[in-house]
Amino acid sequence: MNLEVKKIDTANARLSAKPSIENLEKRYDKIAQKIAQKVKIDGFRRGKVPLSLVKTRYQAQIEQDAQEEMIQEVLKNAFKELGIENKDLIGSPNLTKFEKKDTHFEIEADIGLKPTIVLDKIKECVPSVGVEIPNEEKINERLKQLAKDYAKFVDTDAQRKAQNDDKLTIDFEGFIDNAPFEGGKAENFNLILGSKQMLEDFEKALLGMQAGEEKEFPLIFPSGYHAEHLAGKEALFKVKLHQIQVREALEINDELAKIVLANEENATLKLLKERVEGQLFLENKARLYNEELKEKLIENLDEKIVFDLPKTIIEQEMDLLFRNALYSMQAEEVKSLQESQEKAKEKRESFRNDATKSVKITFIIDALAKEEKIGVHDNEVFQTLYYEAMMTGQNPENLIEQYRKNNMLAAVKMAMIEDRVLAYLLDKNLPKEQQEILEKMRPNAQKTQAG
């Protein structure tokens, strides 16, 4: 077969082979026989179709199957010479050359191998961490917000004019070009003015209305509105206000603590303050990590953890980044790239550094996650996407299905694992007293979030 293999480094190998034409042709009869057992041709019983007829009718398929079989044999022999197995591979080998000559084929392929990653310098990569401890002023602000959020809405006098923070019960219907539109109508709809639950201009139009009042007003949907069929269009809304309710103020005392910490025995204002302080600490930590330290940690990992990267995976990542970039390009730029192979190649090459860094960090994170037994369940991925859908006004099931169809669920899971691994490394580098705050707060992290 005239096979040559070369181990370039610990993560890359290359093969070159020249199998003969006979090597391919000897496979034809066996493949044709397999096809003959399955196909149905008029005038012949299944399995009784003459081989000559099968070869004529299915020539292209036989040729393709024979080539694939021959390539797999080449790869199998190459793996044997390299002393590797399928479990050592990362991704599929990349066929870079397949040419038919007079007497043989010329085949070349790049083989990506799972890299060897040494994590002995991880501690050097983690930046120093110091989270701001919430002061009394911040704690009191959050207590006031909790008192507001947990306050009940009660009826008010009929003469009251609607103000921000009032709870309104309304009927509304929207029209575009005198015709109602999908999603533009609701009855007995509850809305807290100023909450940005609806478009800002919609809520502003309700200010000053009284119970029983009806009103019509124009509204232009923003050009970037999530419902594309409404984006940039002018609508006329008809609204009837049924009821106005106001918050019944709560005192900041032990009674408030019992409401907020309903699952705690003997909840007191002192305990609530401790919980609020811990929650604010977690929020400060998340802000510091997301805005500064995670990126710094990634840069350090990229710089200090050195190992060979499989070229095949970098090339795949470059393709992905290039394709994604096309979606955000102007039509003229896309056309320019389509018309010039050289420009397209140059543009794709511009993503090499980003692709290399992305692949490297992914391998490091994967190794750390396995070492520290950090993972993400599929249900957590679905919960994350469900929350994203709710925040962007999309149908959760449709969004999840969209991610599934585009094979993006694995990428979401990997991003979540990366976030957890980075947070884990940074948490370990917190001062001892802050680690104690964090440990104390873990079971209670969700209890005192405002809203």
Curated annotation (Swiss-Prot):
Its EC number is 5.2.1.8. It is an enzyme of class 5 (isomerase). Keywords: Cell cycle, Cell division, Chaperone, Cytoplasm, Isomerase, Rotamase. GO terms for cellular component: cytoplasm. It catalyses: [protein]-peptidylproline (omega=180) = [protein]-peptidylproline (omega=0). Residues 165-250 form the PPIase FKBP-type domain. Signal peptide: none annotated. GO terms for biological process: 'de novo' cotranslational protein folding; cell division; chaperone-mediated protein folding; protein transport; protein unfolding. PROSITE patterns: FKBP_PPIASE. It is found in: Cytoplasm. Its main location: cytoplasm. The keyword Transmembrane helix does not apply. GO terms for molecular function: peptidyl-prolyl cis-trans isomerase activity; protein folding chaperone; ribosome binding. Disulfide bonds: none annotated. It comes from the Bacteria. InterPro entries: PPIase_dom_sf, PPIase_FKBP_dom, Trig_fac, Trigger_fac_C, Trigger_fac_C_sf, Trigger_fac_ribosome-bd_bac, Trigger_fac_ribosome-bd_sf, Trigger_fact/SurA_dom_sf. Belongs to the FKBP-type PPIase family. Tig subfamily. Consists of 3 domains; the N-terminus binds the ribosome, the middle domain has PPIase activity, while the C-terminus has intrinsic chaperone activity on its own. HAMAP family: Trigger_factor_Tig. Involved in protein export. Acts as a chaperone by maintaining the newly synthesized protein in an open conformation. Functions as a peptidyl-prolyl cis-trans isomerase. This is Trigger factor. It comes from Helicobacter pylori (strain P12). The lineage of its organism: Bacteria, Pseudomonadati, Campylobacterota, Epsilonproteobacteria, Campylobacterales. The gene is tig.
